[in-house]
Amino acid sequence: MLDISIQELIKQWQKYLILQRNYSNNTVIAYNNDLKHFLEFMNYYNSELVTINHIKTVDIRLIRSWLAKRKYENFTASSIARGLSTVKNFYKFLEKTILLNSHIIFSIKSPKKAKLLPKALSVDDVLISLEHIEGYGNVKWVELRNKALLVLIYAAGLRISEALSITKLHLQNLEFIKIIGKGSKERIIPWLPFARNLITKYLGILPYKLDENEPIFRGKHGKKLQPSVFNRELIKLKRVYGLPEYLTAHSFRHSFASHLLEYGADLRSIQELLGHKSLSTTQKYTQTSIKHLEAVYNTAYPIKK
Protein backbone atom coordinates (compact mmCIF):
# COMPACT_ATOMS: atom_id res chain seq x y z
CA MET A 1 0.00 0.00 0.00
CA LEU A 2 1.06 3.60 -0.60
CA ASP A 3 0.88 6.70 1.50
CA ILE A 4 -1.64 9.21 0.09
CA SER A 5 1.12 11.78 -0.53
CA ILE A 6 2.98 9.31 -2.77
CA GLN A 7 -0.17 8.59 -4.74
CA GLU A 8 -0.49 12.32 -5.38
CA LEU A 9 3.15 12.54 -6.49
CA ILE A 10 2.59 9.70 -8.94
CA LYS A 11 -0.38 11.53 -10.46
CA GLN A 12 1.74 14.68 -10.81
CA TRP A 13 4.53 12.65 -12.41
CA GLN A 14 2.10 11.14 -14.94
CA LYS A 15 0.83 14.61 -15.87
CA TYR A 16 4.43 15.78 -16.23
CA LEU A 17 5.23 12.92 -18.61
CA ILE A 18 2.21 13.70 -20.80
CA LEU A 19 2.20 17.52 -20.72
CA GLN A 20 5.88 18.36 -20.39
CA ARG A 21 7.62 15.38 -21.99
CA ASN A 22 4.94 14.61 -24.59
CA TYR A 23 4.91 10.89 -23.77
CA SER A 24 2.09 8.86 -25.29
CA ASN A 25 -0.63 7.38 -23.11
CA ASN A 26 0.67 3.87 -23.80
CA THR A 27 4.17 4.85 -22.67
CA VAL A 28 2.83 6.43 -19.49
CA ILE A 29 0.80 3.28 -18.76
CA ALA A 30 3.93 1.14 -19.20
CA TYR A 31 5.94 3.48 -16.95
CA ASN A 32 3.19 3.44 -14.35
CA ASN A 33 3.16 -0.37 -14.32
CA ASP A 34 6.93 -0.46 -13.83
CA LEU A 35 6.77 2.03 -10.96
CA LYS A 36 3.85 0.16 -9.39
CA HIS A 37 5.88 -3.06 -9.49
CA PHE A 38 8.81 -1.29 -7.81
CA LEU A 39 6.69 0.28 -5.05
CA GLU A 40 4.85 -2.97 -4.38
CA PHE A 41 8.20 -4.66 -3.94
CA MET A 42 9.28 -1.86 -1.59
CA ASN A 43 6.11 -2.39 0.41
CA TYR A 44 6.86 -6.14 0.65
CA TYR A 45 10.55 -5.53 1.43
CA ASN A 46 9.83 -3.13 4.30
CA SER A 47 6.67 -4.92 5.51
CA GLU A 48 4.91 -1.61 6.01
CA LEU A 49 3.12 1.22 4.23
CA VAL A 50 5.45 2.97 1.78
CA THR A 51 5.97 6.60 2.74
CA ILE A 52 7.95 9.53 1.36
CA ASN A 53 10.67 8.68 3.83
CA HIS A 54 10.97 5.16 2.35
CA ILE A 55 11.30 6.71 -1.10
CA LYS A 56 14.05 9.05 0.10
CA THR A 57 16.04 6.45 2.00
CA VAL A 58 15.79 3.44 -0.32
CA ASP A 59 19.17 1.70 -0.54
CA ILE A 60 21.04 -0.19 -3.23
CA ARG A 61 20.25 -3.57 -1.68
CA LEU A 62 16.52 -3.04 -2.12
CA ILE A 63 16.91 -1.88 -5.71
CA ARG A 64 19.16 -4.79 -6.63
CA SER A 65 16.78 -7.21 -4.93
CA TRP A 66 13.94 -5.78 -6.99
CA LEU A 67 15.93 -6.18 -10.22
CA ALA A 68 16.82 -9.75 -9.23
CA LYS A 69 13.13 -10.50 -8.59
CA ARG A 70 12.20 -9.25 -12.06
CA LYS A 71 14.88 -11.46 -13.56
CA TYR A 72 13.59 -14.44 -11.53
CA GLU A 73 10.10 -13.70 -12.86
CA ASN A 74 11.49 -14.03 -16.40
CA PHE A 75 11.33 -10.38 -17.37
CA THR A 76 13.52 -9.79 -20.43
CA ALA A 77 16.73 -7.79 -20.11
CA SER A 78 15.02 -5.05 -22.11
CA SER A 79 12.04 -4.95 -19.71
CA ILE A 80 14.32 -4.92 -16.66
CA ALA A 81 16.33 -2.05 -18.15
CA ARG A 82 13.14 -0.13 -18.92
CA GLY A 83 11.89 -0.69 -15.36
CA LEU A 84 15.08 0.74 -13.89
CA SER A 85 14.90 3.64 -16.34
CA THR A 86 11.31 4.29 -15.21
CA VAL A 87 12.27 4.41 -11.54
CA LYS A 88 15.18 6.74 -12.35
CA ASN A 89 12.75 8.94 -14.28
CA PHE A 90 10.45 9.10 -11.26
CA TYR A 91 13.33 9.98 -8.94
CA LYS A 92 14.48 12.67 -11.37
CA PHE A 93 10.98 14.13 -11.16
CA LEU A 94 11.15 14.03 -7.35
CA GLU A 95 14.40 16.00 -7.45
CA LYS A 96 12.48 18.82 -9.13
CA THR A 97 9.28 18.66 -7.07
CA ILE A 98 10.25 17.80 -3.50
CA LEU A 99 13.89 18.82 -3.83
CA LEU A 100 15.11 15.29 -3.32
CA ASN A 101 18.90 15.24 -3.30
CA SER A 102 20.79 13.31 -5.97
CA HIS A 103 19.93 9.72 -5.22
CA ILE A 104 21.98 6.54 -5.09
CA ILE A 105 19.67 4.98 -7.68
CA PHE A 106 21.37 6.96 -10.45
CA SER A 107 24.61 5.07 -9.84
CA ILE A 108 23.04 1.71 -10.75
CA LYS A 109 23.75 0.64 -14.32
CA SER A 110 21.11 -0.95 -16.49
CA PRO A 111 21.57 -4.61 -17.41
CA LYS A 112 23.05 -5.17 -20.84
CA LYS A 113 20.50 -5.97 -23.48
CA ALA A 114 21.11 -8.99 -25.64
CA LYS A 115 22.23 -8.02 -29.12
CA LEU A 116 19.93 -9.69 -31.58
CA LEU A 117 20.82 -10.10 -35.22
CA PRO A 118 18.24 -8.59 -37.56
CA LYS A 119 16.03 -11.16 -39.24
CA ALA A 120 16.59 -11.89 -42.90
CA LEU A 121 13.75 -11.24 -45.31
CA SER A 122 12.60 -14.00 -47.61
CA VAL A 123 13.54 -13.65 -51.28
CA ASP A 124 9.83 -13.14 -52.02
CA ASP A 125 9.59 -10.25 -49.54
CA VAL A 126 12.69 -8.66 -51.06
CA LEU A 127 11.27 -8.94 -54.58
CA ILE A 128 7.90 -7.54 -53.46
CA SER A 129 9.70 -4.61 -51.84
CA LEU A 130 11.80 -3.90 -54.93
CA GLU A 131 8.74 -4.14 -57.17
CA HIS A 132 6.46 -1.89 -55.14
CA ILE A 133 8.69 0.73 -53.51
CA GLU A 134 8.52 2.67 -56.78
CA GLY A 135 4.79 2.18 -57.06
CA TYR A 136 3.41 4.85 -54.74
CA GLY A 137 3.93 8.56 -54.22
CA ASN A 138 3.61 11.43 -56.66
CA VAL A 139 7.22 12.48 -57.33
CA LYS A 140 8.77 10.23 -59.96
CA TRP A 141 12.42 10.92 -59.20
CA VAL A 142 11.86 10.32 -55.47
CA GLU A 143 10.19 6.98 -56.21
CA LEU A 144 13.09 5.97 -58.45
CA ARG A 145 15.57 7.17 -55.82
CA ASN A 146 13.95 4.91 -53.23
CA LYS A 147 14.11 1.90 -55.52
CA ALA A 148 17.71 2.57 -56.59
CA LEU A 149 18.81 2.97 -52.98
CA LEU A 150 17.05 -0.19 -51.82
CA VAL A 151 18.44 -2.21 -54.72
CA LEU A 152 21.94 -0.89 -53.97
CA ILE A 153 21.75 -1.88 -50.30
CA TYR A 154 20.52 -5.37 -51.14
CA ALA A 155 22.67 -5.92 -54.24
CA ALA A 156 25.90 -4.79 -52.58
CA GLY A 157 25.22 -5.52 -48.91
CA LEU A 158 25.89 -1.92 -47.90
CA ARG A 159 25.16 -0.22 -44.63
CA ILE A 160 22.64 2.59 -45.07
CA SER A 161 25.37 5.12 -44.21
CA GLU A 162 27.63 3.65 -46.90
CA ALA A 163 24.89 3.67 -49.54
CA LEU A 164 24.01 7.29 -48.78
CA SER A 165 27.67 8.26 -49.26
CA ILE A 166 27.86 6.94 -52.84
CA THR A 167 29.00 9.62 -55.32
CA LYS A 168 29.38 9.81 -59.10
CA LEU A 169 33.02 8.87 -58.61
CA HIS A 170 31.86 5.42 -57.47
CA LEU A 171 30.12 4.94 -60.81
CA GLN A 172 33.23 5.40 -62.95
CA ASN A 173 34.33 1.78 -62.65
CA LEU A 174 31.92 -0.42 -64.57
CA GLU A 175 32.88 -3.63 -62.75
CA PHE A 176 33.49 -2.82 -59.09
CA ILE A 177 32.47 -0.38 -56.40
CA LYS A 178 35.01 0.61 -53.77
CA ILE A 179 33.55 1.18 -50.30
CA ILE A 180 35.24 2.77 -47.30
CA GLY A 181 33.42 1.26 -44.34
CA LYS A 182 33.71 1.30 -40.55
CA GLY A 183 37.19 1.98 -39.24
CA SER A 184 38.15 3.34 -42.69
CA LYS A 185 38.43 -0.23 -43.98
CA GLU A 186 38.24 -0.51 -47.74
CA ARG A 187 36.41 -3.28 -49.53
CA ILE A 188 35.63 -3.92 -53.18
CA ILE A 189 32.24 -5.23 -54.31
CA PRO A 190 31.27 -6.28 -57.85
CA TRP A 191 28.71 -4.03 -59.50
CA LEU A 192 25.52 -5.77 -60.52
CA PRO A 193 24.47 -4.28 -63.90
CA PHE A 194 20.87 -4.22 -62.65
CA ALA A 195 21.81 -1.94 -59.73
CA ARG A 196 24.16 0.26 -61.71
CA ASN A 197 21.66 0.77 -64.55
CA LEU A 198 18.93 1.70 -62.08
CA ILE A 199 21.16 4.30 -60.43
CA THR A 200 22.09 5.72 -63.85
CA LYS A 201 18.37 5.98 -64.68
CA TYR A 202 17.73 7.76 -61.36
CA LEU A 203 20.53 10.25 -62.00
CA GLY A 204 19.03 10.94 -65.41
CA ILE A 205 15.86 12.41 -63.87
CA LEU A 206 17.33 13.85 -60.65
CA PRO A 207 16.41 17.57 -60.74
CA TYR A 208 19.61 18.69 -59.00
CA LYS A 209 23.08 19.11 -60.50
CA LEU A 210 25.78 17.42 -58.45
CA ASP A 211 29.55 17.56 -58.38
CA GLU A 212 31.34 14.26 -58.81
CA ASN A 213 32.20 14.05 -55.10
CA GLU A 214 28.69 14.82 -53.81
CA PRO A 215 26.43 12.00 -52.54
CA ILE A 216 23.95 11.11 -55.28
CA PHE A 217 20.96 10.30 -53.07
CA ARG A 218 19.18 13.58 -52.29
CA GLY A 219 16.17 14.67 -50.30
CA LYS A 220 13.20 16.47 -51.85
CA HIS A 221 14.87 19.86 -51.35
CA GLY A 222 18.24 18.84 -52.71
CA LYS A 223 20.12 18.15 -49.51
CA LYS A 224 21.84 14.84 -48.77
CA LEU A 225 19.23 12.19 -48.00
CA GLN A 226 19.10 11.24 -44.32
CA PRO A 227 18.64 7.63 -43.09
CA SER A 228 15.56 8.61 -41.07
CA VAL A 229 13.80 9.90 -44.20
CA PHE A 230 14.44 6.68 -46.11
CA ASN A 231 13.34 4.54 -43.16
CA ARG A 232 10.03 6.43 -43.13
CA GLU A 233 9.57 5.40 -46.76
CA LEU A 234 10.13 1.78 -45.74
CA ILE A 235 7.56 2.11 -42.95
CA LYS A 236 5.00 3.22 -45.56
CA LEU A 237 5.95 0.26 -47.73
CA LYS A 238 5.44 -2.17 -44.84
CA ARG A 239 2.01 -0.79 -44.02
CA VAL A 240 0.71 -0.71 -47.58
CA TYR A 241 1.86 -4.19 -48.59
CA GLY A 242 1.74 -6.03 -45.25
CA LEU A 243 5.46 -6.76 -45.23
CA PRO A 244 7.28 -8.04 -42.11
CA GLU A 245 7.56 -5.59 -39.23
CA TYR A 246 11.33 -6.16 -39.04
CA LEU A 247 11.81 -4.83 -42.58
CA THR A 248 14.36 -2.01 -42.33
CA ALA A 249 17.22 -0.74 -44.47
CA HIS A 250 19.60 -2.89 -42.42
CA SER A 251 17.45 -5.99 -42.88
CA PHE A 252 18.23 -5.81 -46.62
CA ARG A 253 21.96 -5.85 -45.88
CA HIS A 254 21.41 -8.83 -43.59
CA SER A 255 19.28 -10.51 -46.27
CA PHE A 256 22.08 -9.96 -48.80
CA ALA A 257 24.39 -12.07 -46.63
CA SER A 258 21.78 -14.70 -45.75
CA HIS A 259 20.70 -15.21 -49.35
CA LEU A 260 24.29 -15.49 -50.59
CA LEU A 261 24.89 -18.16 -47.96
CA GLU A 262 21.72 -20.00 -48.95
CA TYR A 263 22.77 -19.96 -52.60
CA GLY A 264 26.17 -21.46 -51.88
CA ALA A 265 28.60 -18.64 -51.10
CA ASP A 266 31.23 -19.35 -48.44
CA LEU A 267 31.37 -17.43 -45.16
CA ARG A 268 34.79 -15.92 -45.73
CA SER A 269 33.75 -14.34 -49.02
CA ILE A 270 30.60 -12.99 -47.41
CA GLN A 271 32.68 -11.50 -44.58
CA GLU A 272 34.76 -9.66 -47.16
CA LEU A 273 31.73 -8.39 -49.01
CA LEU A 274 30.14 -7.13 -45.77
CA GLY A 275 33.33 -5.62 -44.36
CA HIS A 276 32.76 -7.00 -40.88
CA LYS A 277 35.23 -6.21 -38.09
CA SER A 278 36.55 -9.77 -38.17
CA LEU A 279 37.70 -9.25 -41.76
CA SER A 280 41.20 -8.15 -40.75
CA THR A 281 41.64 -11.35 -38.73
CA THR A 282 40.39 -13.47 -41.62
CA GLN A 283 42.78 -11.82 -44.08
CA LYS A 284 45.78 -13.01 -42.05
CA TYR A 285 44.97 -16.59 -42.94
CA THR A 286 43.49 -16.35 -46.40
CA GLN A 287 43.99 -13.99 -49.31
CA THR A 288 40.82 -14.07 -51.40
CA SER A 289 41.35 -12.50 -54.80
CA ILE A 290 38.95 -10.03 -56.33
CA LYS A 291 38.38 -12.44 -59.22
CA HIS A 292 37.29 -15.13 -56.76
CA LEU A 293 34.89 -12.71 -55.08
CA GLU A 294 33.43 -11.87 -58.48
CA ALA A 295 33.01 -15.55 -59.32
CA VAL A 296 31.30 -16.28 -56.00
CA TYR A 297 29.08 -13.25 -56.42
CA ASN A 298 28.02 -14.03 -59.99
CA THR A 299 27.40 -17.70 -59.23
CA ALA A 300 25.52 -17.30 -55.95
CA TYR A 301 23.45 -14.14 -56.13
CA PRO A 302 19.70 -14.56 -56.83
CA ILE A 303 19.08 -11.25 -58.67
CA LYS A 304 22.27 -11.16 -60.68
CA LYS A 305 20.48 -11.20 -64.01
Swiss-Prot record:
Entry superkingdom: Bacteria
InterPro entries the record matches: CB, DNA_brk_join_enz, Integrase-like_cat_sf, Integrase_catalytic, Integrase_recombinase_N, Integrase_SAM-like_N, Tyrosine_recombinase_XerC/XerD, Tyrosine_recombinase_XerCD
Keyword terms of this UniProt record: Cell cycle, Cell division, Chromosome partition, Cytoplasm, DNA integration, DNA recombination, DNA-binding
Catalytic residues of the enzyme: 159, 182, 250, 253, 276, 285 (o-(3'-phospho-dna)-tyrosine intermediate)
Domain Core-binding (CB): 4-95
Domain Tyr recombinase: 116-298
Matches recorded under PROSITE patterns: CB, TYR_RECOMBINASE
Molecular functions per Gene Ontology: DNA binding; tyrosine-based site-specific recombinase activity
Subcellular location: Cytoplasm
Gene Ontology BP terms: cell division; chromosome segregation; DNA transposition
GO CC aspect terms: cytoplasm
A Pfam family: Phage_integrase
Paired cysteines (S-S): none
UniProt function note: Site-specific tyrosine recombinase, which acts by catalyzing the cutting and rejoining of the recombining DNA molecules. The XerC-XerD complex is essential to convert dimers of the bacterial chromosome into monomers to permit their segregation at cell division. It also contributes to the segregational stability of plasmids.
The family this protein is said to belong to: Belongs to the 'phage' integrase family. XerC subfamily.
Subunit structure: Forms a cyclic heterotetrameric complex composed of two molecules of XerC and two molecules of XerD.
Protein's UniProt name: Tyrosine recombinase XerC
Organism: Rickettsia typhi (strain ATCC VR-144 / Wilmington)
